[in-house]
Each structure stands twice: as C-alpha cells, then as structure tokens.
C-alpha cells in the first residue's frame, strides 16, 4: 500500500483518536476488530458518532469469517469487512473502489 498511498500506522484506537484529534483527516481508516485497549467495533462507533470523523470510510479487518459480525459492522457504518488472511491485491482493489 505504501507505493500507492500515504499510510499512517497506530498501535491501538486511543492512539488513532489522539492522532485524529490533532487535526489529521485521513481519506480512509483500516481497523482490526480485535485490538488492545479498545475493540474495533467500539472505535467504529466512536468515529460514526463524531461529527468530524463520521464521513471517513472505515474498513474492518477480522480473522473471523462471521456473517452476523460482518452484517452488524456494515449496519453500524463500516464501509467494508475483510477476513484475514487476505490477498494484498484484493485489499488494494477494495480501497481503490472506496476512494474513487
């Protein structure tokens, strides 16, 4: 992804929230569901309830191929749900479709 996009990596959602609160506005957020300190679905809810960040598309990553979890997260505002492990080319295609 680094060849096509400027990427910033955060260790956990609180670190990402701090980065966003400093005025950084990404075109897209990719978030794992299982993370330390705050779950990905909680991070998604925070973003979608915040006027400044609710328009940022969020792609959720999970090692679980759960239809019910996928549907729930898409209904809660995720732009896409990708199951790990995934093909990097597929991820690039999905990102391009979201950003175009």
Task: Enumerate the predicted regions with their spans.
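Two-component/phosphorelay signaling modules centered on CheY-like receiver
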Residues: 1-8, 49
């Amino acid at each position: 992804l680094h060849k096509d996009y400027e990427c910033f990596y955060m260790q956990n959602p609180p670190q990402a929230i701090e980065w966003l609160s400093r005025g950084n506005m990404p075109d897209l957020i990719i978030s794992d569901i299982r993370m330390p300190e705050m779950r990905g679905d909680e991070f998604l809810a925070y973003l979608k309830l915040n006027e400044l960040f609710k328009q940022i598309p969020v792609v959720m990553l999970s090692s679980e191929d759960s239809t019910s979890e996928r549907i729930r997260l898409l209904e809660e505002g995720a732009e896409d749900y990708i199951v790990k492990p995934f093909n990097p080319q597929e991820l690039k295609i999905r990102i391009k479709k979201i950003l175009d």
